């Protein structure tokens, strides 16, 4: 009976999974009871976590002194970091300070190639702008073999490059600041100039600078560009360079009040005005000595 069962449909029979008979698997890897994976599928998959699932959010463990201070709430805003020009080396610091207000947008994804002995190696370059629409903006670019990896890396680099944006008024100081404080210029291949505009004008510019200016929280601005603006990467970098220079100018309202100290003649004028008895000094002339 056992021989009949094995011949009919058992593991060793023609109808069993170990043979290439009718209705069964053909030989090779993965066939039979002791096949590839041993009943656990074709492996656990690649990437983050199990196949088809999402990686669990892990708690942020800072690795720098600045990260520890931010997580322990010793530093509560980015302005305290910018005040002392401390380098930000963890993107989680930006997430911790700005939180859900931070928005990102992919400006462009372009393929780039490198000639090698084996042929052309193609990678993808991603340009990502990030900002909170309230005075903070960043720009990042990353190359990778995969588009998703390039975008993810560009977002991290954009967070690390976030700069504060100084805003001002065009005329009367009524309401909230709405435009750039003064004329600023940025250069990266092409030259971009930002000019203050009256309230209600909007952003008069090309689409790429307009996205960066909106993310920076600027509502009204004139722009002018010179050079080759068709290269999106250089155009975006020049705009970001101009925006980052808004805190580079020491405007008169930031000048420290100069305190002049009086000279002793001015400080003791009343004392010098008092009448004093004049002391006359008689000069006595020494008698001449005759020499022989």
Curated annotation (Swiss-Prot):
Compositional bias, Gly residues, is annotated for 7-34
Cross-link Glycyl lysine isopeptide (Lys-Gly) (interchain with G-Cter in SUMO1) mapped to chain: 274
User: InterPro entries from the xrefs?
Assistant: Ribosomal_Su5_D2-typ_SF (IPR020568), Ribosomal_uS5 (IPR000851), Ribosomal_uS5_C (IPR005324), Ribosomal_uS5_euk/arc (IPR005711), Ribosomal_uS5_N (IPR013810), Ribosomal_uS5_N_CS (IPR018192), Ribsml_uS5_D2-typ_fold_subgr (IPR014721)
Gene Ontology CC annotations of this record: cytosolic small ribosomal subunit; nucleolus
**Keyword Phosphoprotein attributed:** yes
What does UniProt say on post-translational modification here?
A: Citrullinated by PADI4 in the Arg/Gly-rich region. Asymmetric arginine dimethylation by PRMT3 occurs at multiple sites in the Arg/Gly-rich region.
Enter cross-link residues for Glycyl lysine isopeptide (Lys-Gly) (interchain with G-Cter in ubiquitin). 54, 58, 274
Q: Name one GO molecular function term.
A: structural constituent of ribosome
Q: Which UniProt keywords apply?
A: Acetylation, Citrullination, Cytoplasm, Isopeptide bond, Nucleus, Phosphoprotein, Repeat, Ribonucleoprotein, Ribosomal protein, Ubl conjugation
Looking up Gene3D superfamilies in the UniProt record yields: 3.30.160.20, 3.30.230.10
Record cross-link Glycyl lysine isopeptide (Lys-Gly) (interchain with G-Cter in SUMO2), residues: 274
* GO term, biological process aspect, one: translation
Q: Spell out which residues are annotated as carrying N-acetylalanine.
A: 2
Q: Name one Pfam family in it.
A: Ribosomal_S5_C
Q: List the disulfide bonds.
A: none
- Tell me which residues make up the S5 DRBM domain: 102-165
Transmembrane domains' residue ranges: none
**Chain intervals for the UniProt region annotation (Disordered):** 1-56
Describe, as the record does, how this protein assembles with itself and its partners. Answer: Component of the small ribosomal subunit. Interacts with zinc finger protein ZNF277 (via zinc-finger domains); the interaction is direct; the interaction is extra-ribosomal. Interaction with ZNF277 competes with the binding of RPS2 to protein arginine methyltransferase PRMT3.
User: What does the UniProt function comment say about this protein?
Assistant: Component of the ribosome, a large ribonucleoprotein complex responsible for the synthesis of proteins in the cell. The small ribosomal subunit (SSU) binds messenger RNAs (mRNAs) and translates the encoded message by selecting cognate aminoacyl-transfer RNA (tRNA) molecules. The large subunit (LSU) contains the ribosomal catalytic site termed the peptidyl transferase center (PTC), which catalyzes the formation of peptide bonds, thereby polymerizing the amino acids delivered by tRNAs into a polypeptide chain.
* Entry similarity comment: Belongs to the universal ribosomal protein uS5 family.
**What is the protein's given name?**
Small ribosomal subunit protein uS5
What species is this protein from? Oryctolagus cuniculus
